[in-house]
Design a protein with these regions (language model features):
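Residue-level hotspots within well-ordered secondary structure
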Residues: 198-321
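Acidic, low-complexity intrinsically disordered segments
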Residues: 21-205, 229, 288-321
Length: 321
């Protein structure tokens, strides 16, 4: 329904063949990466790059896709202000009524993108631009859309994913007289952006008792939790099925070490296990095992107190002699 609302005229008036001339590939990244680990409540900027699979056309004429983010609110993508993308956005191009950045609905963005003025419209106010050729040709990818979101305050893995991609390309050799013929473009590969939200970052995975080593646990509960009290807990018997503390599931199994960390905060074994997060929601603790921990794997996680509304993921530490 949404697709036909703003592109029907372009598709029906200028597409003469149902055979796909090229495929459009998408790549969603942040800082040129498709998979990153960040803390809770962190702002993330993303780019969505498009590239045609070959040079069998004269470039992109129209594109649209949906975007979903499993980690919370997703606002509209940015309105383009420079070429080539401003040729695809109102008023130079044509996009859906909600804007080039997509229609927000049920936590998703529907139909990000737009079309160039391939019908050479001069009657209606929109579209009123001139067509750019060779947009997103193979070997010359372009940024189709940019935007921002904030990571979840619940630790886990989330994906910014594009779906329902459809596009047209300008037929090779076209001059724009009387209009620009376009051909269907297939949906190519889509590389989504995967975000791991972690609240603990250990400095090392293994410590030696004889070398008097320690594992420093850098805590990050996000800026909304600044100034709150935290408690680091531990277990020597794994993370599943875990237990419940003050109504919140904690991914640590109850054993003697768990009870020790619960009832003896700030011990010589788990230094600074209870404290107050700083103005950015960060803190630190340190695991300093003695000989009784040799050849064991300790797991640690932290919760926030009063009330207990936040729990981190577990992080492990292998203790060697």
């Amino acid at each position: 329904m949404i697709k036909t609302s703003f592109l029907a005229a372009f598709v029906s008036a200028t597409v003469a063949s149902l055979a796909s001339a090229s495929d459009l590939n998408l790549n969603i990244q942040t800082h040129m990466l498709n998979h990153v680990e960040v803390g809770p409540g962190q702002p993330i900027g993303y780019t969505i790059t498009g590239e045609l699979s070959d040079n069998a056309s004269d470039g992109l004429a129209m594109f649209a896709f949906d975007l979903s983010w499993g980690g919370g609110f997703l606002g509209q993508a940015d309105v383009p202000v420079a070429d080539p993308m401003k040729r695809f956005a109102n008023p130079e191009g044509l996009n859906n009524p909600a804007g080039f950045g997509g229609t927000p609905k049920n936590g998703r963005l529907f139909q990000i993108g737009g079309a160039q003025n391939t019908i050479n419209n001069t009657v209606a106010p929109v579209p009123n631009g001139t067509v750019l050729t060779n947009v997103a040709q193979h070997g010359s990818p372009v940024i189709l859309a940019t935007g921002q979101f904030t990571t979840s305050y619940r630790c886990g893995t989330y994906t910014l994913a594009a779906t329902n991609l459809f596009a047209n390309v300008i037929r090779q050799g076209e001059t724009g007289t009387p209009f620009w013929h376009v051909d269907p473009c297939g949906a190519g590969t889509i590389q989504n952006l995967v975000i791991d939200v972690h609240a603990i970052k250990p400095n090392v995975p293994t410590v030696s008792v004889s070398a008097h080593q320690q594992q420093v646990l850098r805590l990050n509960a996000g800026p909304n939790n600044a100034g709150r009290q935290y408690l680091v807990l531990g277990s020597l018997s794994g993370t599943s099925p875990g237990t419940t503390q003050n109504g919140v599931h904690v991914p640590l199994n109850v054993d003697s070490y768990f009870n020790f960390t619960l009832n003896n905060p700030n011990s010589a074994i788990l230094v600074q296990s209870m404290g107050v997060l700083d103005s950015t929601g960060r803190g630190s603790a340190a695991f300093r095992p003695d000989a009784t921990f040799q050849n064991m794997t300790a797991n640690h996680a932290f919760i926030l107190l009063n009330p207990t509304t936040f729990v981190s993921e577990p992080e492990s530490c292998v203790v060697v002699p």
